[in-house]
Amino acid sequence: SHSRLLLFFAGWSASPESFTGLKAENGTDIMLCYDYRDMTFHEDLSSYKEIHLIAWSMGVRMAELALAGKYALTTATAVNGTPRPIDDNFGIPENIFRGTLDNLTAEDMKRFNRRMCGSRDILAQYEKFPARPLEEVKDELQHIYNHCNGQSMTNADDTTSIQWTRAIISSDDHIFPAANQRNYWNGRCPVTEITAPHYPFYLWKQWNEL
């Protein structure tokens, strides 16, 4: 086992196969977290000297809830997400999230993936990965809604257990509005803007390129 860990929290509905193409540097282990129906984090990370967290989309808030401040993170990078993922100013507007939740069909899932990928080419690439069952991702979305909905969201800082060191924002994000991401991150940590859709991982071959 290595002394450096790259810990990745995926977004809603993602299958792990859509990230396995990304390689780690020598001496680095990779751990992928996905499927937020169960938020118990069983792994013991205490043997790692360095933990580099990368969280995408809904994974930003899910990482905060799952890790609950238990580990010192060397770096923490948010990609197209914020700690306030269901929020009219800082996340996905509540009515849009609720609309997705209330009637999620296979057709809606297709539309979601299309918007997430932004172009036919990227979508074709993404659709090669095995999709998770509709009932499962529906259930996951409900759990995410419940996880995010309980807290009083008066002050964003009160609910943040992770010191985020960097945010990456896709300017062409049609899922998690770039303007709302900017609203949240500006003044909180360094921000890198990229020209990409909500799913930007096709841009990179290695995790350290982020």
How would you describe each model-predicted region?
Residues 69-103, 142, 204:
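Flexible "cap/lid" loop of the alpha/beta hydrolase fold
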Residues 161, 167-169, 173:
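Short beta-strand/loop motif that positions the catalytic acidic residue
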Residues 54-63:
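Gly/Ala-rich beta-loop-alpha elbow adjacent to hydrolase catalytic centers
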Residues 21, 163, 176-187, 205:
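Short alpha-helix in the alpha/beta-hydrolase fold that links the catalytic acid
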Residues 85-128:
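Helix-rich cap/lid subdomain of alpha/beta-hydrolase
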Residues 175, 191-210:
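Catalytic histidine-centered segment of alpha/beta-hydrolase-like enzymes
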Residues 1-40:
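Conserved HGGG/HGGXW glycine-rich cap/lid loop of the alpha/beta-hydrolase fold
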Residues 125-154:
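Hydrophobic, aromatic-rich cap/lid helix
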